[in-house]
Structures are given as structure tokens and as C-alpha cells.
Amino acid sequence: MAVSERRGLSGESPTQCRWGYLSLLVLTLSGCSGRIHRLTLTGEKRADIQLNSFGFYTNGSLEVELSLLRLSLQETEKKLPKVGFSLSRVRSGSVRSYSRRNSHECPLDRNSSNFLVLFLINIKDLQVQVRKYGEQKLFISPGLLPEAPTQSGPPKPDPAGTPKDNHVIHPSPTEMSAVKENQTAPQVSGDKTTPGEHRHSSERQPPTQDPSGKEKDQVLGLGHLNDSYNFSFHIVISSRAEEGQYSLNFHNCHNSIPGQEQPFDLTVMIREKNPEGFLSAAEIPLFKLYLIMSACFLAADIFWVSVLCKNTYSVFKIHWLMAALAFTKSVSLLFHSINYYFINSQGHPIEGLAVMHYITHLLKGALLFITIALIGSGWAFVKYMLSDKEKKIFGIVIPLQVLANVAYIVIESREEGASDYGLWKEILFLVDLICCGAILFPVVWSIRHLQDASGTDGKVAVNLARLKLFRHYYVMVICYIYFTRIIAILLQVAVPFQWQWLYQLLVESSTLAFFVLTGYKFQPAGDNPYLQLPQEDEEDVQMEQVMTDSGFREGLSKVNKTASGRELL
């Protein structure tokens, strides 16, 4: 949505600028890692970091490997477990944020009756204490799952909800022995320990308020090497009762008090997987959805081009721009579908295909906003020059679309726990809102112009017909923005986690309906009032009257190329 052809709007051609933006976007993709997440933070001072959110089905698994954690703590601070992870099951579409909580409250100290798992890192005793809250039977064990060969093939989603495979994965004897080893005596060798070598007794007093009724907490080993700490664990969703949307967060409560933050380094790998692949529950149907919608947009574009070829006398440049928009939208959805296919099968996208998706998405967004604004202003249909106000609108919308697409690519390629992830997400929302409001101004100005001209220029019938058409188009644009920005978000919040893909279905269906209605309203037909060019000005009318009265034009005819073909005077 960032780059556009401004030819016809000004005298410059931004080809060099466009390729510069594309080069910048390609370089931005270097950190893209798909659903196998790798996050490295250096000198971080945030107290709470939202690492990731994922929807799990039965037999889904979560693997977390903290390979490096370097803290700048004093000896007194090492005695308290104020650093760790939290895993919670969140409501679908909800946004978890710790920015507004009390600065003196630590999420690792709270008790909860809801589904919650805390991993408390005890630096002094070199152990990780696991506390569970709520009714749950999550299977948590140290280490990572053994790597299995990646299964190729398209994902096979079950849009109705949970997969039909309801059998439960039971822990293997090896995993059970690993859990028992956690309760044996520690084995320490010098200053270097590893999670497999350092074990502590799990005989602890239970939490003061534990709704789950567990008598003791599970303990995992914590490795220590060169002033850094490491450990790993994996979780298996073993029953349908444990399915849902899970949110994983990292907390450093030593930095909760403003002005007393201490920098720390963090390197973590997160691997999330469902039985069908690496996609979240809400993303599994998107592969087929984007493929079907791509075919629908392509079919609509082919039909539109055939209409243009049959009405060559009534076709303007804006009609071909609309055809280019539909084709670009189709190609963008195709690359998006292929991108999800490889993410599901391999855990990460193919970088070249991801770049093509971002480029086509960029062009599609630019063509969309430019086409809506040009139709609303009447360019190419009624006039070939834009007013100063309309030029200012394009001067605002086009740079904002560049910024919006940069924000979109940063969000797609960065990890959720990156320090600037939230900032770019807010920029995308704000810029998109401004662009949606800006494209309405040309339509409103055209409506006012037609209202003023309907009773003054002698062409009341034509202007009233155009006014009615512009009002319909204004309502169409409002409905398009309303459905794709507001209703879609409300739907995403309301539906369960496995139905989150309905958000994308509503957005793409609304876009297709908007394209079809726009093409129907402004099709190159002779009786379309929008395509009827304005008649001669008053001076031409007076000259025509003089020539007619003098008999000079007797037997002559004048041919005008208008939207209704050839007109005989």
C-alpha cells in the first residue's frame, strides 16, 4: 500500500523512489522466521515482554528454550524469584497488556483461579519452579521434543472447530524418568552446570492459595554458564479441555519500578505446533481461504477485462486501473496462500515468496486507495485535471501508504516480543485510519459540486443522476471501511479461537463485494450518467447558435467522443 504510479497526478514519475522503497522492504525481511520464533534482546529494560500467542488443538505442543539470560542483579536481589515466564490461556481476540498495571505488582507473585502456569527462575538455587493455577492437567517436562521429519503437503484444516482425533498422548517412559530425575539430589561441578546436571528436590511448601489443590510444585533444572542462565521445557496439550489460545510472556519484576531498571540480555527460541503443522488453530484454514479468494478476484478481473474490450468507445484509463487493481489483489492473495503453506509445513516461509507477497501487497494497497480517490474526484471520467485540494489529498495519502506498508512488513517480519513491535502496530492502525478518512474527501467535494451545479448550468437531469450515483458510491465506501475495519475486529473478539479465520473471510468477502459493486456502478456503458462528459461551455454554445442561424452548418455534423458513443449535432 505504499508505492503508487503518480503519473497523471503530477509531472514526476516516482520509479526510482518506488524501487528504493522495495529494496528497503526486502532488506527488512531478513529477520523473518515464521512460526519457529527466535528472539534476541540486548540491553533490554522492559519489565514485561509479550513473547507470543498461539491457538492449540489436542496433541499440540509448545517448546521453549531459553539459551541465554544474563541479568545485572545484586546479591540481595538474587534471593527472590522475580524473573520468569507466564503461560496463560486467554480469551479469543483479547489483548493482554501489562502497561497499565501497578508498577509495584509482579505477575509472578499473583495467585489466580484462572488457567495460569508460572515458571519462576531461582538464580540462587539454580532451579525453575513451576506453579500451576486453575483446573488443568498440562504435561510439562524439561528439554525439547525430539525432532521429527517434517511432513509435506497442504494443511488439512477442520473449520468446524476441534480436529476429530481426540486421543491423548501419554508420556513416554523416557519422559517419565526425566521428570523423576528432577526430584533427585543436585550434582554440581564447579561454576558450570547444565539443566541436565543440576537437579534439586521438589519438596516445597505449596502456595498459600492454590485452587488446583496440588501438594507441591514441579521443579526444573537451571543451567549456569559464564554469568548466563539457560533451561528448556516443552508442553503437550493432551486433552480437549486444554485446547485454546495461549499467551506466553516473560517477566523481570526487578525492572517494575520506574527509574530503577537494570538492562538484561535474553535469547529464547519458541516452537509451536499443531497436529496439522506449524500454523495456529485460527490460521489453519487460511491456506485454502486465500487460494479460493484469489481465484474469485481473478475471475472477476477476467470478466471486467472482457467488458472493457466490448465497450472500447466508453473505456477510460481509470477502467484499466481498476482491472490492474483486481489482478494485483488476486496475485497478492495467491502469494499469501503459498506463504502460509510453507509456514505450515516447514515452520517458516520461503524468503523469496515472502518478498513477492509483500511487494504485491504494497502495490495492491496503493492502487486501492488511489483508485477510490480518483473515482471519487471524477478524474478521467469527467475531468483530466485535479484541483489543488485533490492534489493535496493524494500528497497526503500516498506517503502515508508508504508508511503503512513499512509498518505492515515490520510487524510481519519481527517477533512479537521485539521492543518496537507495539510501536509499529500502533503506527499501522493510526495511518490506516487517516487514509480511510482522507479518501472520503474527494467524494464529498464532488457531491457538493454537483449539488451546486445542478440548478445553475442548465443540465439538471444529468447532474442529478450523477449526484445520485456519487451518493451511492459514498455509501459504498463507508460500508467498505465499516465492514473491513470495525465489524471485522468485533467479529474477531466475539468468536472462539478456532473461528478467528472468519475475520479474514469477512475482510476479503467485503473487498470482493466492493470491487464488484464499484465495477457495476461505473461500468463503461452508454447510459451511465457518470460517464457522460460535460457539454460545451457557454462560449461554444453561443458560437454554435450563430453558426446555426447563419446556415453555415447546414448539412454538417459534429462528432463528439462521449461515454455514450458518437453524438450527432
UniProtKB/Swiss-Prot annotation:
Glycans are attached at N59, N111, N182, N226, N230. The keyword Phosphoprotein does not apply. Residues 194-203 have a biased composition (Basic and acidic residues). Pfam families: GOST_TM. It is found in: Golgi apparatus, cis-Golgi network membrane; Golgi apparatus, trans-Golgi network membrane; Golgi apparatus membrane. High expression in spleen, lung, stomach, large and small intestine, and thymus. Residues 1-34 form the signal peptide. Its main location: Golgi. It comes from the Eukaryota. One of its GO terms (biological process) is negative regulation of toll-like receptor signaling pathway. It is a multi-pass membrane protein. Keywords: Glycoprotein, Golgi apparatus, Host-virus interaction, Membrane, Signal, Transmembrane, Transmembrane helix. Disruption phenotype: Deficient mice are viable and fertile and exhibit normal Mendelian segregation, however deficient mice exhibit increased LPS-induced mortality. TLR-mediated pro-inflammatory signaling are increased in embryonic fibroblasts and macrophages from Gpr108 deficient mice. Depending on the AAV serotype used, 10-fold to 100-fold reduced expression for AAV is observed in Gpr108 knockout mice following retro-orbital administration. Residues 144-219 are annotated as: Disordered. Residues 180-192 have a biased composition (Polar residues). (Microbial infection) N- and C-terminal domains are essential for mediating AAV transduction. Belongs to the LU7TM family. This is Protein GPR108. The gene is Gpr108.
